[in-house]
Every structure is written in C-alpha cells, then in structure tokens.
Amino acid sequence: MKIIVDMMGGDNAPLAVLEGTAQAVKEYGVQILGVGNEELVRRTAADNNIPLDGIELVNCTQVIEMCDEPARAIRTKKDSSIVVGLNLLKEGKGDAFVSAGSTGALHVGASLIVRTLRGVKRPALATMVPAKKQAYLLLDCGANVECRPEMLAAFAVMGSCYVNKVEGRQSPSVALANNGAEESKGTPVLKEAHQLLKTTPGIRFVGNIEPRDVPNGEVDVVVCDGFTGNVILKLTEGVAKMLLGMLKQMFLANFGGKIAYLLLKGGVSDLKHQMDSEEYGGAPFLGAKQPVIKAHGSSKAKGIKNAIRQAKTCVENDLCGTMQSALDELAAANKPEE
C-alpha cells in the first residue's frame, strides 16, 4: 500500500512530517510517496538522522499557505504539494492522501481534483472527538457552513459507514445536533432533516441530540452543518484545555495538591491521553472518491503517523466503496415514484 503525504503541510513541516512518515513505514509497513521541496526534505532528514527507507520523494516548487484563498490557490499553484499530491492520488499513483496543510485548499482540491462520490455535492470534514463514554464522529466540522437536509442525510450515511469500517463499531447510532430533543425543535432545515433521517436506509437514527449531551459520548455519530460542528469542536477543545489547566493549578497550589497529584498521577495521564487529538489521527473528507485525510495543522510526529494509520485503515476496509454503495441505496430510496 502506498500513501501520498504532503511533506510541506502544517506548522511543524517538514521535520514532524518526516518523523511521522518514517515511524509509519516502520510500524505499519506502508510505502510513502512524499510530495514537497525535495532538497529541503532530504537536508532535513540528513540533519536529523531520519531514514528515508520506504519513502519516495516527488519534488514540487510551491506551497499553499494558510493565508491563501483556497479556490484561487488550487487554480494557480499547480506545483504545490497539495495539488501535486491530489493529482497523484487521482492518477492512481497512491491509495490515499494525507496532509496537515490548508483545510480549505484540501476541501476544494478533494472536490475538484479527486472528485466526489455519486450523491455527494461536497465532501464533509469529519473528526473523532473525545467524550466521556467513548469518542464520537462529528461531521461536518467546518467544511460546509450551510447544508441542505439531503446533505445532512448523506453525512449520516457516510459517518455511519466510517465508524463501522474504521472504528469497528457495529450498528453505530446517529444523532442530529439540535437545540432540543423534540422533533419540532430547530430550524426548518433541521426539522426536514430529522424527518429525512428517520427514513434513511442503512443507519440507526436515534433522533436529535442537544449540545449539552454531546460530550457524554452516548452516540457514535453526530451530524450537523459545518458551522455548528466547528463551534462544537472548538468549544470542546477549549473546555478540555481549561480543565486540564485548572487541574494543574490545583495540584501545584500547595503541598497537599502535590501529594494528591502523586496519588492521581495515573488517572491524570490517562485523561490527557484520552483528550489528545493526535491519538485519533486526522479528519477525513468523507465523500471524496478516494481517502483524503486532514491532519491537524499543529501535528507533531505522532499525529502524522496516526493520520497515515487512519488512511491505511480506510483503504484496507474499502471505505469509499462502502460509502458509495450506501449512498446509492439512499438515492434509490429517495427516488420519486413514476
């Protein structure tokens, strides 16, 4: 299996990307097609004693920056690591693409270069979010700010497939993020989406879920538009950071706190591990014809390695093929009777 990796994407590129890809080659047995400034990548590898075994490099001269307008960048920076990498994926030179680069550029590129599955207007950005009982899949978490009901139904189908194939959960539960549990709550779009989800084949829809209940992790998939999802995601990250900071302050405040920390050290370490987003890899663009994984922009080696593991799992389980079959079933169910 060959995974295409953007060597120039993210705050810590190319060093962290190199370290993560080298670890992935060793641990997962994958081949890497690294796209980026070859001279810089080779020099960084040599300076840090990082082996390039199993890593083939493809040179490119441009990088899409976070400040670039996504659609314009995809059109004009043809020799950027993202555009070159996505084209290599489209051409069958690799099985999946991983990048910690611009989310907007990846969304546009996944739509225009890799293209989308039948029944998908635009790919949804999905991510596993830590929660009390178990992590849940949140989609869309930022790619599509406004969504029609049929888009939310497609998200539900794809999210259910992902949690089943990649996370290994049987008959995953799907909920619609809303401001109330009752069917009558929400905007007209959410009310219509609720009715549509009740009759969507292939998913186990459990109704609306209020934001206060989302962190409990009682459902496997939470469906929403990209604006709502991004708010949920960033609020979760902020609250987690705040709580860990408050715990640290409490433990360091006095001698008693330090003693308490020694007694609770194992539990605190487990909590930090559970809340570490790098453990979950990256955020897939569900709905692209081939796996495109967005690693966090601040990813270190572990995050890159786990994003590659995630891409490998998607390919091994034919996630895109499974989603296409489920989407075709959805389209057939919603086809008007003649």
Please provide the spans of the model-predicted regions:
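N-terminal phosphate-binding or glycine-rich loops at protein starts, especially the Walker A/P-loop
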Residues: 1-42
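Phosphate/nucleotide-donor binding subsite
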Residues: 50-94
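Glycine-rich phosphate/nucleotide-binding loop
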Residues: 111-124, 130-138, 218-222, 226-336
